[in-house]
Amino acid sequence: MSEQRALKNPYPDYTGLGCAQDLFDMQGNLTQHFATSISSKISELLAILENGLKNADPRDCTGYTGWAGIALLYLHLHSVFGDPTFLQRALDYVNRSLRSLTQRWVTFLCGDAGPLAIAAVVYHRLQKHQESDECLNRLLQLQPSVVQGKGRLPDELLYGRTGYLYSLIFVNQQFQQEKIPFQYIQQICDAILESGQILSQRNKIQDQSPLMYEWYQEEYVGAAHGLSGIYYYLMQPGLVAGQDRVFSLVKPSVNYVCQLKFPSGNYAPCVGDARDLLVHWCHGSPGVIYMLIQAFKVFGVRQYLEDALQCGEVIWQRGLLKKGYGLCHGAAGNAYGFLALYKITQDPKHLYRACMFADWCMNYGRHGCRTPDTPFSLFEGMAGTIYFLADLLQPARAKFPCFEV
């Protein structure tokens, strides 16, 4: 049943450096020929994207399906290629986003924090420091309501506290300085921890998992709405005040997620769901893998890496999705799992597999995949595929956008 959601992987698997010699060298640098073919495909897809965006929703400000996501793509292209016209495009699109903020959601991907954070970085690169500071001030004005959890704010990435947390981390990483004071970040993490403890105790599972989170009364597991996405951030160095709490609260909660693994190596969308169906970044191995790799980095337990490697096998076998080529539930998003494994292991097999998924993406539209609701957006559509292809040009620096830190 699960196989029906993916197309059969037509690529031969990695057998040694010989099969990858046209793709990259022993240091993981792409060959000039392969890099040139990726760059030309990016240019080709950008022309299609720009034309398609003429019919996009003018009021969608978000990173997920709207203008902020397109702005982030161009900001990324500016980082990779250094072309100032990309930065100007980022400014054009982020200004559209700022004109139509939700006034409701507070996250990077689906709310107002993303447009404000992206705008602050774009303005900063353009030396427009007053405008940049204004966006940062507006971003920080949201912080008290996020800590307090106003409006029954959830904790997950797309609509909750973690999504606001990422916005603050994004700013500090892009500015390469502590532009957002660290106590603001730790206060968010404290609130996330407290919320997780309350639900765990309410559900009487604190002995199994000291933390628990839900979204619309469901205990989601994946990166977008669930436990693995939240724990990935709570294990980042220094975000949680007091390393003892990472060991006493986060580690056993991570272990609880590990116990939910299917025999295949995949993970359910929700606690208690026995169907091994989804191999997406949002639900399944391609999102859980980041939690596992971070747990291995922090706790040094080999089993976390073994589980992450098993996620890689699931992605290789079932990751070329009929849903298309996007980030959230598509081939590009799934390919980032290989890049994460490559960065932690330096095993060229994982870079090779990412290159094969890139080849699939470079044949965009030729596999009979479904057309997304927002076919040119960052998380559902073509913009996300372009973002991935640009990231593959420098694999050691690649990060899943709006998520990986």
From Swiss-Prot:
Chief place where the protein resides: cytoplasm
Cited InterPro entries: 6hp_glycosidase-like_sf, LANC-like, LanC-like_prot_euk
Record-linked Gene3D superfamilies: 1.50.10.10
Residues annotated as binding glutathione: 323, 370-373
Membrane topology value: Peripheral membrane protein
Reaction(s) the record says it catalyses: RX + glutathione = an S-substituted glutathione + a halide anion + H(+); 1-chloro-2,4-dinitrobenzene + glutathione = 2,4-dinitrophenyl-S-glutathione + chloride + H(+)
One MF annotation (Gene Ontology) recorded for this entry: zinc ion binding
Single GO cellular component term: cytoplasm
Alphabetic keyword roster: Cell membrane, Cytoplasm, Membrane, Metal-binding, Transferase, Zinc
GO terms (BP aspect): carbohydrate metabolic process; peptide modification
Localization, UniProt: Cytoplasm; Cell membrane
Enzyme Commission number(s): 2.5.1.18
Stored SMART domains: LANC_like
List of residues binding Zn(2+): 282, 328-329
Family the entry assigns: Belongs to the LanC-like protein family.
General function of this protein: Functions as a glutathione transferase. Catalyzes conjugation of the glutathione (GSH) to artificial substrates 1-chloro-2,4-dinitrobenzene (CDNB) and p-nitrophenyl acetate. Binds glutathione.
Protein name in the entry: Glutathione S-transferase LANCL1
Protein's organism: Danio rerio (Zebrafish)
Gene: lancl1
